[in-house]
Amino acid sequence: MKNFLDKIFFKSNNLDNISNNIKELTSKTSVNKIFDVVNSYSSESEIRYVGGCIRKILNNEEVDDIDLATNLEPKQVCEALQKENINFYESGIDHGTITATIDKYKFEITTLREDISTDGRHAKVKLSKNWKEDASRRDFTINSIYSDREGNLFDPYNGKEDLKNGLVNFIGDVDKRIKEDYLRVLRYIRFFLNYSKHPHRLEVIRKLKINIKGVSRLSKERLLDELRKIIKINSLEKLAKDKICLELILMIFSEFKNFNIFLKLNSTQKDILKKIDFIFL
């Protein structure tokens, strides 16, 4: 959903004043229709913003993607959308996700879930009605924040405070979280470079290094997609200054050993190479 709504910006620097920002997001997007159809499905149906879009609103970043969580089951979501003639597709239904399309934009609507088992790449899940259970399966506290369209937060792991204080904390046991999905090694790097105001915790780094071999089990597509996000958000210059993050990257992508050459290029040359995906080959 690139350039979503010409990249909405939120001007306030006050993390306690997000209600208006979320209301603005709701009013300026087609997502309001989805809230309406889900909330009207039954007296007990609920739907909330979740994850990256809330994190970005809190941090005054541009919102380029909207994810939603609901206590409705996928088939019920389909029924609700169908009733109002909202287009959708079910390619992610095995994982509890229905993708609605309105005005050419996509909105992922995912049923609350609980992990049953995982092989380090994909989790087997069962559907849930429990918001805290759903939050507990997420990777970091800053990604486990939910909000209704009025801006009322559900934040069981104090992700808002962690974001405000520049803390990147795993939810629960670090080793378990990483083993559930080895991509979280790279996600830690991305979020640490972007949000942390503190040194790395040695115990976290130890767990990341212990589990880093598991990253090789992931698909090339998932790895490169996450690497692109790291570069896009943080730039190689920022990565170069963090020796621990750089060490982890080099353990995964040995091709990066000569990336200092890239740092010596001027901005125009860097932009050209990024456009042709040179640095991801």
Where would I find each of the regions flagged by the language model?
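Catalytic cores of the polymerase beta-like nucleotidyltransferase superfamily
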Residues: 1-281
